[in-house]
């Protein structure tokens, strides 16, 4: 059966007598709904199952609606649907387009690595080798177990003689650590710490944090209330931080788009967003779909950010260069 260019014309009417502008209204409606979700995601209510936060965790993926709707729009030869698709396309590009460009560049004098090593990681020694390949000045770890700690110390203590462990989080450093201690994030046990890293270029306050986990439940929605309260507590600690140069390394169990992390994200900037290349998704490691692991700063300049190769964890390690 021959297929000619005439079959692609848009000026004719379909079998129901509809023109290119009078068909495809359902597709157009779906396109405009996608645009509205992207543009007004902060207005999506969070009261029922924290649905707004759940949606914001995977917000970049809403852009996939554009190619999905584009195919039937072309098959229907609907000018209305195609015109409507311009809205979510432009909004998505304005929101996330800058993440697709490589923003790295410039010199650096400080490197940080962040990793949730996973309590079920059976080969933490190999994981530490992966982290050290980035030649970091500090390494932050979360979900450390008592059984894992000896193997971690065996790998790291030689190159990183200064370290502090509080509960299930730890920080290893090439430079002396002072003023170390736990940070209360209101969960009843220790999953955050603070330390001053005395670098050759001055002191940097480093926070390591592991926000409470979130769950998606059929009967309860996105259960994130405990994490949200912890974000408020950590945000308060950051507000009271006396040092001008601040670095936060952690598994925040939320993305930069998540409104619940605003007490933190309004004070600090993302290294990936400022100096990375791409979205830098870090979880799950088998098919990274969201960046819930963060390196964020205030008073220091990120010059590069990237993800490291997969380890035995369900999270990818992340790294960043800084100019102090």
Give each language-model segment a name.
Residues 2-153:
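N-terminal, active-site-proximal structural segment of metallo-dependent hydrolase catalytic domains
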């Amino acid at each position: 059966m021959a297929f000619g260019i005439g079959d692609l014309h848009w000026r004719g009417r379909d079998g129901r007598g509809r023109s290119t502008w009078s068909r495809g209204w359902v597709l157009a409606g779906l396109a405009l709904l996608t645009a509205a979700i992207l543009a007004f995601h902060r207005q999506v209510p969070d009261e029922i199952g924290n649905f707004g936060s759940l949606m914001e965790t995977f917000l970049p993926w809403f852009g996939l609606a554009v190619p999905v709707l584009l195919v039937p729009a072309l098959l229907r030869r609907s000018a209305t649907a195609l015109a409507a698709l311009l809205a979510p396309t432009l909004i998505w590009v304005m929101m996330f387009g800058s993440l697709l460009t490589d923003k790295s560049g410039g010199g650096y004098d400080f490197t940080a690595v962040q990793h949730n090593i996973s309590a079920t990681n059976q080969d933490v020694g190999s994981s530490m080798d992966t982290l050290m390949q980035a030649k970091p000045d500090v390494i932050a770890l979360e979900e450390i177990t008592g059984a894992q700690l000896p193997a971690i110390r065996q790998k790291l203590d030689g190159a990183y003689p200064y370290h502090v462990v509080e509960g299930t989080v730890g920080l290893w450093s090439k430079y002396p650590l002072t003023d170390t201690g736990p940070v209360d994030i209101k969960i009843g046990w220790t999953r955050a710490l603070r330390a001053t890293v005395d670098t050759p270029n001055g002191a940097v306050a480093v926070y390591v944090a592991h926000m409470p986990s979130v769950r998606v439940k059929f009967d309860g929605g996105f259960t994130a209330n405990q994490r949200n309260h912890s974000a408020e507590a950590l945000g308060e600690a950051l507000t009271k931080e006396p040092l001008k140069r601040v670095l936060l390394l952690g598994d925040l169990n939320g993305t930069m788009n998540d409104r619940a992390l605003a007490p933190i994200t309004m004070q600090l900037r993302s290294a990936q967003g400022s100096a990375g290349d791409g979205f830098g998704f870090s979880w799950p490691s088998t098919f990274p779909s969201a960046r819930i692991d963060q390196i964020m700063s205030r008073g220091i300049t990120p010059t590069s950010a990237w993800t490291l190769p997969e380890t035995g964890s369900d999270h990818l390690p992340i790294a960043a260069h800084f100019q102090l």
